[in-house]
Amino acid sequence: MRGCTEVITLLNAQVDPDTGYDVYTPTKITGVSWYSMAAATVTTSGLLAADQYTVRIPVDADFSGKGYVNPIAYKTADPAKSFTIQRGDVIVRGTIDTPSRITAADLSRLIGSDGSYIAFTPPDPTATTVDAITPASVQQTCSDVFTVLSITDNRKAPHAQHWKVIGK
């Protein structure tokens, strides 16, 4: 595909069986197309604005050595060897320096006060508090982060096989 020069980090959610909380596993994907636009809707109660993102991920992109599995198989898959694309996952434009798995609370620590991405420092392993930080709150902090709303699987096309991911 043409214009596939961007790098993204896909954060897949997987439920930790010990805690019951979502744990996010990052996958760096190189060679994708990133498009964003400001979208607005006028309603009787005022103007509603939300950025819309479209990312096209070619099947021949660099997935950092991981293989794609469908969302159902990902629930029990080894996240170090596989990734999926599903509603609710988070996509960040660029590379995030993280450990292999991060929690929703850790995700909030990846954003600097100026909105830029920073190197990740693992939290104190002896801490027992659980922060209520969610991917949605990260999206409010940085303009180049979105939550996946829909996925179109275009891998059966004769040319330019890819996944089309749309989010806000």
Question: What are the functions of these language-model segments?
Answer:
Residues D22-K168:
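Short, conserved turn/kink motifs that form compact alpha/beta structural patches or helix kinks used as
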Residues M1-G20:
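Polar/acidic, low-complexity leader/linker segments enriched in S/T/G and N/D
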